[in-house]
Structure formats: C-alpha cells, structure tokens
Amino acid sequence: MDFALSFEQQALVDSLEAFCKRELYPHEALVEELRYVPDDIRREIRRKSAEAGFEGMNLPEEWGGPGLDKQTKMQVERVMGKPSAALGQCMNRGVTGILFKCRGEQIAEYLLPSIRGERRNAFALTEPGAGSDARAIVTKAEREGGDWVINGVKQFISAADIADFIILTAVSGVDQTDKGP
C-alpha cells in the first residue's frame, strides 16, 4: 500500500501545520500558566480557523466536516496532536464521537450547539478503581420514575470546570453477566 500523500493532501497538511505554528503555538505558554484558554483567544482561534477552512476538520461530512479520507485525517490528527489539546479544541475539535449518536431532541440540545461552538462537553469515564477500563466502572445509573439517578464517583474529568454538560459513563444493568453489569 502506498502511504505517500498526494499533492493536495500534502498541501492541506502543510497549511494546517503553518496555521498551528502561527495561531496556536504562540498561546501555549499562557494557556499552560493559566491552565485554560481565555475566551478572547478561543474566539479568535475559532474565527481564524473557520476563515482558513480548518474548523471542524474531524467532523463527519454530514455534520459539516470536510469528509477527509483516512490517510489525510490521520495526518491532520498528527499535526493537531502537536499543540496543546486545549488550543486544538478551539478549532471545533471538541465534538466527542459519542455525540454523533445523539437522537431526536438530543441533536438540537447537545450535538448542534457543540458543532457551532456554543456548548462544551466533558467526558466522565475515570473512577478511583477504573481508569480507562470501562468494564471496571461501578458508578450506577438507576431508573426512578422517569428520571435516571446516578450514584458513584468520577475523577480526572478534563474541562469539567468549563463544560456546559458532561457525558458520564455508568452501568445500568442489575444482573452480572460475562460482560459486566
């Protein structure tokens, strides 16, 4: 299999790399010191990335993304892995894959505002006894009437302090199975 990029693919990757060097890297020291991206910088990066055609590069085509092939997407992710993740999120990269599973009212409430940059999410998976091992999760979600009641402890939730909503993982089954509760 030939992994060489076409001229167009390489041009996209090179221009994205130049954009990151020009627009993201200069803010890294400040973001590291503050431990967050100030709103004015976030808005500026978002505006400039949209103008340059780089906003939402990881989005599927049906949700406004460029519909990159896998090889180009891999190279885009390689380039975007170099600057601070917090700064990369400013380019509309904070749309967690699970949001694309939204249905009905969830699309208008969570997915579309996240794509537009109006709402930010955090992902709560890690627990004291379950790092990234989803099968070790003990936080429970139980139905009470028409509501879900969550009982458990989560930790190390990146961006929880600035998120508009949190996507939380929990077990909801009552019976132990070979795949967990």
Give the predicted meaning of each segment:
Residues T139-E142:
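A structural signal for short hydrophobic beta-strand segments in well-ordered beta-sheet cores
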